[in-house]
Amino acid sequence: YVQERSAVYVEALKRGTSFYLVDRVIPMLPRELSNGICSLNEGCDRLALSCIMTINKKGEVIDHKIAETVIKTNRRMTYTNVKKILADKDAAVIEEYKELVPMFEKMAELAAILRKKRMKRGSIDFDFPETKVVLDEDGHPIDIKPYDRNVATKLIEDFMLIANETVAEDYFWQEIPFVYRTHDKPDSEKIAKLSTFINNFGYTLHIGADEVHPKELQKLLMKVDGTDEESLISRLTLRSMKQARYTTACTGHFGLAANYYCHFTSPIRRYPDLQIHRIIKENIRGRMNDNRREHYESI
């Protein structure tokens, strides 16, 4: 729906992303697309680009296929209701969605396996509390409440991460021009300063050859979890790291301890995802010739 060089394409490129304000959303794409024909609305057939994966009990992707598909959403679910099913064991909600409960339970089982595998390799999870602002009828802020990051939101995060990793690795080995989401190793000087600071609280970092493994930072965050100094040390750890970037070279993602990573899952609200979808579709349709490769390399 967003053709290259069209007016919608040009405007999406200018915006780059959707903006989520306190009381409204300014979408990257026109609302007719973002809330309509591109949105997985209940009971509607929608064109999609899917990463279909076979994952074993160890959390390893043993087979996958990236394909143009048609998705029809049978039921519209909310994070709240999925949480009530999986965590709260709410009898009324379980009864309402009883035909879907076994699938949610399998999804939760798989998400836990994927999360455990990421943590084992050293992926860092900054679980900062998010907030939402409550407004009165006149649009004035009257309260700030914590945003609940629960089993349902984490489940979706786990699935998005594995899809992004799988797509990035696939296109890296195909040697097709691509946009990766990369996160470089932190500067040794900043890590040294962090190490010196946390020593005051009795914590240490093992730094080898002037660099630190993400697993060391993960261990630190686990040690400070629930302590009085957790907020301070967690934020200083985050500031010690570099910002993630979009690059055409696949140099890995330090924070996720991943060799391959991209942003594939949100083409409605992020321009890099939209560009990736365009590249993938051209490749699937057999149109990725030398001219198109040169075109993508040039931009």
Show which residues each predicted segment covers.
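Conserved, carboxylate-rich catalytic/transport cores that coordinate ions
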Residues: 1-299
